[in-house]
């Protein structure tokens, strides 16, 4: 990764909720075009870490350097601008139920980025075609399956041209038969060169698609190494135990 630009650098990140210390000094770096999966047991701090990266949770201490700027110190509109540069896909779909797909996709680019309605619609149709939903532009969320909703949610993030995509267990709320269609979109996105940080329970995705995997347990990084190495030669007893349970 020496020749790849550092997009995010996390230094001694800590997060406390009252007296509960959820993140206990996380340090790691994410590079351009890298796909990193974050795995680990429930309650280990994975989602909190991801939410800290785009300031949905305010870190208690430490630094998050986004293109060299410590975003832990920014306020107001600067936070909004930062979040525009980081797409986020949650477990739940968070689509506007009173809008059809096209309006769900074009509202933010038109209102926030100043894109013309025609350009936004053209871009939306192009992205919908890439995720196999070109025929659903006029549908409302209530008319879509869970897998379709999550693919639309991914497209909505891509409409803002993010530099990094954050995924917080994007398949955990889906029926089993719909998981594959969302993972296929994420795999295509990874192959296109998008920088991605993915909290996931999908071990096959982590092993086969991610260039690197982080094992987060008890608020600390247990292992952080290339995915094939982490899965083939786990070193820590905690990781061995975890993989034996989930593989």
Predicted regions and their residues:
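ABC family nucleotide-binding domain
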Residues: 5-227
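C-terminal boundary and immediately downstream tail of ABC-type ATPase nucleotide-binding domains
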Residues: 215-217, 222-224, 228-247
